[in-house]
Amino acid sequence: MNLPLIDVVIPCYNTEQTLVRAVESVLQQNNLGHLWLIDDASTDNTFALALQLAAQYPNRISVEQMPKNCGVAMARNWGAMLSAKSAVDFVAFLDADDAYEPGALEVAAVTFHFQTDTSVVRLALKPINLAQRYAEHPNFDQAWQYMRMTCGGNIVFNKAFFFACGGFPTHQLFRELGGEDGALGIATTKTAKVATLFEDVGVLHFCREGMHAERLLDGLLFGKQDPAITAEKMAEAEQVTSTICRRIEALKCGLNSAEIGIRPLVVERTE
């Protein structure tokens, strides 16, 4: 069976302690196309380490460095743009402090191969070393469902659909508060087929105190709301999602037109 290949983008910022683990988990995937490491102007040895890894696997890994720290959304988007020059039709995003389980990309490739109308695949997201206050909460499974549907590190896109969405939103709002992956993730579920593979192999999500997911879990499980997330900013984020949806629907309208080809038109003007 000739399953499709999948390019992988890993955004990196001060991740020298975990990058090797993430990269090794990607390289063991049978359906890997090419791996792009995008250093977001790290201040530690991440970039040097990435170059070392690329030197070991020159045909499988490419490294780029952002000219300044631009945030994870921009780093992901830049990696996807670089991957666009390959013949591979799909791109996955993995965080530098997480890791794929063996066979993770294969289950995504199988899905795209047999379910050709799939635009997005969501891999299983498995928390490792999650604090007991979350893991033992009676509503944890429900809260984690939201996490794995909005996280940026367990998602695989049809590249054409990803670019049609405009990539991950890079608005200043998300630089301040995070959530760009959520804004895009919600838009995908409103405009396209999103296949979830939550009962299969996927992504090991290594947890730590202070991680971004804590804010989400604190809100969902304990009702703790970040005072920085105001109603106005929530409305702004929702508007970003709405804009992505509007653009996709407009694109569908054009692509589904029965009038394919050159159609000479004349504009009539009235006084």
Regions found by a protein language model. Name each.
Residues 24-33:
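Short, acidic, metal-binding catalytic loop of nucleotide-sugar glycosyltransferases
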Residues 25, 39-49, 68, 98:
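A conserved acidic beta->alpha catalytic loop
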Residues 45, 98-111:
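Acidic donor-binding/catalytic loop of UDP-sugar-dependent glycosyltransferases
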Residues 66-83:
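Glycine-rich, basic loop-to-helix element that forms the pyrophosphate-binding segment
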Residues 87-97:
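Short beta-strand-to-loop acidic/aromatic patch adjacent to the donor-nucleotide binding site
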Residues 174-184:
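Acidic donor-binding loop at a coil-to-helix junction in glycosyltransferase catalytic cores
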Residues 186-203:
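Catalytic donor-sugar/metal-binding loop of nucleotide-sugar-dependent glycosyltransferases
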